[in-house]
Amino acid sequence: MENEEGKREMTKKQSSRFKSICVFCGSSNGNKASYQDAAIDLAKELVMRKIDLVYGGGSIGLMGLVSQAVHDGGRHVIGVIPKLLMLQELTGETVGEVKEVADMHQRKAVMAKHSDAFITLPGGYGTLEELLEVITWAQLGIHDKPVGLLNVDGYYDALLLFIDKAVEEGFILPTARHIIVSAPTARELFIKLEEYVPQHK
């Protein structure tokens, strides 16, 4: 009986409402090993839950770590990269399917089209821009896909405080604050994303 319950629980853990998830992250590794560990942990969760990866197409930094680990785990990987970044963000062999696009705007549109949800790891300006755009799209009703923030070692604490301040000052509606789902680990984040229901409509 206990074995049957265990099997059911394992099946439940491995199934997901998402078929593919777009991951935004840095083309650098960051200065802490915890950022790289978080990227690998996220990849393992995607593989365990049988979720395919859509990402920015780079083979360096956290992007490279996530894509390689998901590909090695047997899941489909779609990398979307603008022509102008091909030399900067690609080194050696690429993994999975690479979609070359004209520019950054098309990159985000294609990534969103092929994804059921978004997860953001630590990153810089480009990562923030991608995150804020999909949050804005959700607020405008362009999509109702969950937006997850993997807040590794409090990396995004200041951003979340800023957003809370914007709510407090009347620039963001309280219901729109709930567009962002955050957690410190991939496993905790997935639990929240699986249960996510939009509140901002």
Curated annotation (Swiss-Prot):
Cysteines joined through disulfide linkages: none
GO cellular component terms, A-Z: cytosol; nucleus
EC identifiers of the protein: 3.2.2.n1
Keywords associated with the record: Cytokinin biosynthesis, Hydrolase
Binding site for substrate: E89, R107, K108, G124, Y125, G126, T127, L128, E129, E130, T136
Translocase in keyword set: no
Single GO BP term: cytokinin biosynthetic process
InterPro entries per UniProt: LOG, LOG_fam
SUPFAM superfamilies xref list: MCP/YpsA-like (SSF102405)
GO molecular function terms attached to this record: cytokinin riboside 5'-monophosphate phosphoribohydrolase activity
Residues spanning the signal sequence: none
EC top class, as a word: hydrolase
Catalytic reactions of this protein: N(6)-(dimethylallyl)adenosine 5'-phosphate + H2O = N(6)-dimethylallyladenine + D-ribose 5-phosphate; 9-ribosyl-trans-zeatin 5'-phosphate + H2O = trans-zeatin + D-ribose 5-phosphate
The family this protein is said to belong to: Belongs to the LOG family.
Function: Cytokinin-activating enzyme working in the direct activation pathway. Phosphoribohydrolase that converts inactive cytokinin nucleotides to the biologically active free-base forms.
Name by which UniProt lists this protein: Probable cytokinin riboside 5'-monophosphate phosphoribohydrolase LOG6
Species: Arabidopsis thaliana (Mouse-ear cress)
